[in-house]
Amino acid sequence: SIIAVIPYFGWARQDRKDKPRVSIGAKLVADLLSVAGIDRLITMDLHADQIQGFFDIPVDHLYASTIFLPYVQSMNLENLVIASPDVGGSKRASSYAKYLDCPLVLCNKTRERANVVATMQIIGDVEGKDVIIVDDMVDTAGTITKAADIMKEAGARSVRAIASHCVMSGPASERVEKSQLEEMLFTDSIPYNNACAKVKQLTVADMFAEAIIRVMNNQSISDQYLI
């Protein structure tokens, strides 16, 4: 059998038609992988959970929260608040907040065009809090840096961010460096050129290795998950 291990499924944002006469890229790549002959896929933090349904083969969907949550707990932040940079990520952020037993804050944003955030409002209280923004990936860093700056203006004591995939394209490194973020934490699902001193990466190698061992031995991988 052939098992494909793809920590960052790069086509995951193309999970639906956003305008006429365009392909659904995630479904196309899923079909190409199946035709190429893979029997199973191991990946992490897909942009949308329903992408698992694009495949006609078993998909093992791992979660970066397995390594992020112990790291957050080790910080021992007194007034921790978990935040989502947009309403779409509220389910993910809510699961973090529930596990860590802390409040949840949401950001409501409107986009002027792709990768450009026009306005943003905070739903919840961040004054005097240590905020950690949770997202699945950071591309141009426009949303996450704007959220951090607005939360600082609203009285947050500190603002950090964690995201599974370090896309960090274009002006992202410069934006993070100039923002109010104290730390930007990623996994190493995508290599980073260390252009920004605020960026730190945690390895997911052990998590994937454990998943591969369990799959090969026909064991359950669900007890790896924390949330």
Task: Name these PLM-found stretches.
Residues 1-227:
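PRPP-associated nucleotide enzymes
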